Amino acid sequence: EAEKCBZZPGWTKGGCETCGCAQKIVPCTRETKPNPQCPRKQCCIASAGFVRDAQGNCIKFEDCPK
């Protein structure tokens, strides 16, 4: 289950969000800004093994389409 989003986009204690299955790990700092192509809040945490699918759902990386 993905963490709940907080109101501040760009960083959570869990790490940073990627836009999708092609970007498994993205370096993340407290200054990380949301990807302009990925306007959702940062709550689908890449370092926890989650990514967004094409519909914007937060899924486990291993569940990405092969």
Curated annotation (Swiss-Prot):
Cysteine disulfide partners in this protein: 5-28, 16-44, 19-58, 21-38, 43-64
Cell compartments where the protein resides: Secreted
Entry's Gene Ontology molecular function annotations: serine-type endopeptidase inhibitor activity
Keywords: Disulfide bond, Protease inhibitor, Secreted, Serine protease inhibitor
Keyword Hydrolase: no
Gene Ontology CC: one annotated term: extracellular region
Protein name as catalogued: Trypsin inhibitor
UniProt source species: Ascaris suum (Pig roundworm)
